[in-house]
């Protein structure tokens, strides 16, 4: 078989190079993506909930821009002109859905008894001093909406929030490439507009993360692959001292890497931060197979006596393959078993890493057993002899040095010194049963303490170093504005059951209903005085009161509902197609409405509750923010008679004392006292900045009727902004609360979500539920997925280790003994992460796979050698010493080589990859050390029969028979 393969050497070489060229050409299709959306399984509830929310409220893909002045304030005509220009131009950039800035955000005002969405800048803004004063006043008048959203507390920074379309022109998810194009176009606009000014601009959001992730990854790939290749190259040269021994293993592993990554590109599998570990992983681990083949090939050359000929050279190659192919295949299979364990993960980057890292190992294995022998076979004999003579000459020079070193080591060779050291380490920790038990117990205790300190966090921003411009900009936004992370809480009305939904008359058109139910006249006073004139509550035509919940059917407000599947004109109001008769048409679905003051009050209370409990929340804006503002505007005094009235000193002191008391007494401050005074006087309607809820405050007989008032407000106002917070402008069945987070910790996000859910369960009226969505929620969901997939992958990999070792040694006890040090290795890895404060996330979760994939080789290597030595003698200490002498140094050398290969990740621009580099190096040390301490300790303590030779088993049986 091998001889036939060698005769086809040129065919193998040409085919291998052709395949490499083909997959190398595929690399031009590489697609780099690093967004939460791409990481999330698209079939998951979290992802689908996000898509539904974007359908109802608009895109949640946000790009933020902050502009900071070194002067006293950003509110100057010059700076506002810059913001206006930037706002206008960005609106024309491809893939931009909307932009919010101080230049175009709505400011709700009252006009002729109605509501109007005006502008913060005012209708006739010209940049005068009066205009600037008016802008400042408007910002103060609605601080819940604007403060830290478009301007900082110190007034030196303004913020622009750009929403990108979630899908491209083909209807596909807007990928990183298009996001970055939009970002670069926007950056050019800002650079031009800010030229000559002192404004410092900062960018944050999904597109910025994608852009920085792309830049960092390309930089890493260009640096780290050559670096790890150099490390492997040097280690190979010092191992073999020949060009063939140096270059061939490296070439094969580079070819395998091209094949693996090329297939990824051909299959349109996106390349992520996790994927960038694959080339380094394959180069560091995959070269071992070529080293095995070449080592035994050189042993075959050493056996040649006389001149090297074509025939005996082919014999040396054949000898090398025959002697090693089983060991190489077993090593490859076990490594694949470790890497493939993440195949069960629902997170696509982890799944793709698992598949293509395992594929790369298989390719390295195949090329090591085909391409390397073929290259050796076609090498001219003259060069083979020359290289071998050069190696021997170099070995002669080294021999002199080794003899000197031998004297310094007390007559021991380097190998003997290493063997003695390893044996002493084993004997100290596991030389006897008590030592083994005590050492293991201490190890477990320390490891469990560290494991409990382990945190799980999947925030992608943590992949970048804190001193990077990207992280510094995010930190600035989190400290000075509302925050750069976003969580959305969706409150929705559930579908009513048949007995809860009143029978409705669907024969009248919506247009007729609106005309009969509403009389949008002018109001001279506030809404509380004008409800009767604006609405016809008493004598609505049959069906109209039921349609809108007005009139004497006041209980309809309590049972607020909306019809689903609206179309045509009815769609504007949330009604379905009412053209068919009620007898033949299918009954429309009815939902609990979000105009119900009970639920609106509860949502507003939830906001106050969450803000008080969580420092990580920088801002909360919701549908209720608009309702409160509309209620305030419509209840502001038209004249200032009350404010102009003369009061006595006694009355003034009483008002002041009351305000002082309501503000908190000695715990209050001037701002709180002034706010309470303004409420007493209803200054600018501030006493009505609330959800209409108190029946005594409004001209209604029951709280249920206040839902009609909310509905009226919604009909009176037309604002694009409010559309982002309600799924229907007039009859909403779901509303959204936007939570701006100053933290990227998924633990904090989890606490906020659970608190919101607990509050809703306790305080929301029947028929309403709450759900979370957005980037913050998806990162939190990924955290749970990482924990689940990590647990599954570890159990799966340990199960595969158990099966492989059990089959190799034909005993389940062998599988258990072999799995113990690997299990301890994984536990120690988590311990180190816990003590070091390194989070378990998407990237660090692959370390367990690497630990098992590589560590199992050390376990099998040691156990195989131990079995061989055990067959030679019954003296277990002698067996152990000989095992260390035969395999100890090889295991240690391989662990150091792999660890050094991964250490090149310490030079990555990603902080998370630096962690992986350090952790894998630690894992290589612990896995090799445990293989050479725990395993011999267990084998010597229990002397299992699966390690005995056939002759020893028969002798033992014979001894038992004689004793009986």
PLM feature segments, named:
Residues 1-34, 373-374, 378, 382-460, ...:
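Signature of alpha-helical transmembrane segments and their immediate interfacial
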Residues 43, 48, 51, 55, 81, 92-243, ...:
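Extracytoplasmic
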Residues 221, 250, 289, 302-345, ...:
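Pore- and gate-forming transmembrane helices of large, multi-pass membrane proteins
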Residues 3-9, 218-271, 344-348, 792-837, ...:
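Interfacial segments of transmembrane alpha-helices in multi-pass membrane proteins
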């Amino acid at each position: 078989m091998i001889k036939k393969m060698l005769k086809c050497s040129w065919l193998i070489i040409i085919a291998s190079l052709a395949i490499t060229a083909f997959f190398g050409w595929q690399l031009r299709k590489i697609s780099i993506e690093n967004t939460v959306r791409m990481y999330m399984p698209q079939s998951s509830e979290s992802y689908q909930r996000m898509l539904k929310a974007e359908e109802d409220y608009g895109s949640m893909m946000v790009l933020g821009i902050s502009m900071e002045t070194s002067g006293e304030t950003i509110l100057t005509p010059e700076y506002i002109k810059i913001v206006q220009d930037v706002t206008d131009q960005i609106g024309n950039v491809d893939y931009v859905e909307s932009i919010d800035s101080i230049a175009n955000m709505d400011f709700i005002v009252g006009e002729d008894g109605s509501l109007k969405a005006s502008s913060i800048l005012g209708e006739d803004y010209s940049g005068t001093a009066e205009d600037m004063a008016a802008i400042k006043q408007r910002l103060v008048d609605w601080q819940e909406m604007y403060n830290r959203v478009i301007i900082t507390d110190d007034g030196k920074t303004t913020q622009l929030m750009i929403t990108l379309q979630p899908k491209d022109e083909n209807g596909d998810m807007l990928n990183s490439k298009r996001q970055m194009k939009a970002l670069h176009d926007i950056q050019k606009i800002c650079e031009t507009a800010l030229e000559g000014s002192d404004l410092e601009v900062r960018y944050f959001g999904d597109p910025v993360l994608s852009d920085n992730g792309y830049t960092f990854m390309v930089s890493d790939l260009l640096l780290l692959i050559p670096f790890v290749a150099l490390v492997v190259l040097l280690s190979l040269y010092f191992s073999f001292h020949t060009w063939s021994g140096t270059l061939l293993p490296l070439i094969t592993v580079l070819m395998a890497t091209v094949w693996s990554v090329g297939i990824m590109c051909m299959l349109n599998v996106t390349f992520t931060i996790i994927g960038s570990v694959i080339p380094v992983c394959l180069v560091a681990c995959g070269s071992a197979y070529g080293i095995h083949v070449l080592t035994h090939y050189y042993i075959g050359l050493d056996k040649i006596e006389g001149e090297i000929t074509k025939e005996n050279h082919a014999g040396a190659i054949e000898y090398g393959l025959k002697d090693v192919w089983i060991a190489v295949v077993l090593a490859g299979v076990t490594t694949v078993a470790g890497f493939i364990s993440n195949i069960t993960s629902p997170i696509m980057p982890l799944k793709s890493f698992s598949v293509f890292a395992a594929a790369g190992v298989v390719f390295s294995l195949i090329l090591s057993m085909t391409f390397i022998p073929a290259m050796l076979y076609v090498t001219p004999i003259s060069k083979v002899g020359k290289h071998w003579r050069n190696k021997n000459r170099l070995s002669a020079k080294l021999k002199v040095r080794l003899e000197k070193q031998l004297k310094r080591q007390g007559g021991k060779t380097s190998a003997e010194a290493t063997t003695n050291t390893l044996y002493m380490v084993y004997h100290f920790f596991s030389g006897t049963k008590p030592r083994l038990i005590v050492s293991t117990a201490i190890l477990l205790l320390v490891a469990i303490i560290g494991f409990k300190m382990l945190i799980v966090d999947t925030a992608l921003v943590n992949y970048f170093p804190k001193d990077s411009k990207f992280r510094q900009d995010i930190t600035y936004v989190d400290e000075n504005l509302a925050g750069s992370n976003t969580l959305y809480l969706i409150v929705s009305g559930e579908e009513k059951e048949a007995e809860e939904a009143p029978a409705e008359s669907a024969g009248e058109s919506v247009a007729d209903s609106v005309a009969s139910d509403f009389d949008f006249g002018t109001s001279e006073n506030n809404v509380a005085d004008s409800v009767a004139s604006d609405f016809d509550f008493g004598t609505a035509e049959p069906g109209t009161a039921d349609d809108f919940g007005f009139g004497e059917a006041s209980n309809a407000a309590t049972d607020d509902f909306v019809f689903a599947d609206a179309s045509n004109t009815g769609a504007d109001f949330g009604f379905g197609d009412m053209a068919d008769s009620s007898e033949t048409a299918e009954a429309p679905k009815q939902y609990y409405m979000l105009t119900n003051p009970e639920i609106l009050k509860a949502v507003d209370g939830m906001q106050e509750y969450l803000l008080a409990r969580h420092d990580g929340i920088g801002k909360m804006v919701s549908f209720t923010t608009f309702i409160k503002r509309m209620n305030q505007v419509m209840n502001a005094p038209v004249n200032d008679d009350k404010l102009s009235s003369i009061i006595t000193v006694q009355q003034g002191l009483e008002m002041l004392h009351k305000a002082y008391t309501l503000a908190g007494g000695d715990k209050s401050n001037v701002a709180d006292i002034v706010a309470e005074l303004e409420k007493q006087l209803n200054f600018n309607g501030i006493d009505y900045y609330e959800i209409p809820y108190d029946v005594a405050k409004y001209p209604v007989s029951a709280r249920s009727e206040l839902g009609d008032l909310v509905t009226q407000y919604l009909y009176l106002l037309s604002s694009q902004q409010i559309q982002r917070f309600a799924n229907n402008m007039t009859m909403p069945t779901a509303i959204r609360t936007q939570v701006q987070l100053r933290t990227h910790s998924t633990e904090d996000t989890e606490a906020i979500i659970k608190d919101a859910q607990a509050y809703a369960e306790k305080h929301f009226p029947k028929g309403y539920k709450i759900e979370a969505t957005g980037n913050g929620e998806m990162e939190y969901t990924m955290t749970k997925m990482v924990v689940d997939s990590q647990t599954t992958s570890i159990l799966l990999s340990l199960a595969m280790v158990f099966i492989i070792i059990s089959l190799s040694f034909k005993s389940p006890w062998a599988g258990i003994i072999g799995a113990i040090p690997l299990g301890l290795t994984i536990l120690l890895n988590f311990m180190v992460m816990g003590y070091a404060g390194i989070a378990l996330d998407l990237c660090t979760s692959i370390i367990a796979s690497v630990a098992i994939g590589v560590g199992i080789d050390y376990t099998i290597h040691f156990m195989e050698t131990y079995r061989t030595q055990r067959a030679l003698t019954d003296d277990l200490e002698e067996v152990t010493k000989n095992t260390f002498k035969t395999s100890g140094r090889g295991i240690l050398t391989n662990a150091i080589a792999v660890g050094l290969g991964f250490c090149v990740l310490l030079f990555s621009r990603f902080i998370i990859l630096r962690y992986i580099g350090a952790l894998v190096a630690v894992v290589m040390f612990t896995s090799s050390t445990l293989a050479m301490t725990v395993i011999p300790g267990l084998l010597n303590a229990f002397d299992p029969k699966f390690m005995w030779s056939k002759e020893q088993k028969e002798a033992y049986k014979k001894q038992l028979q004689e004793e009986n």
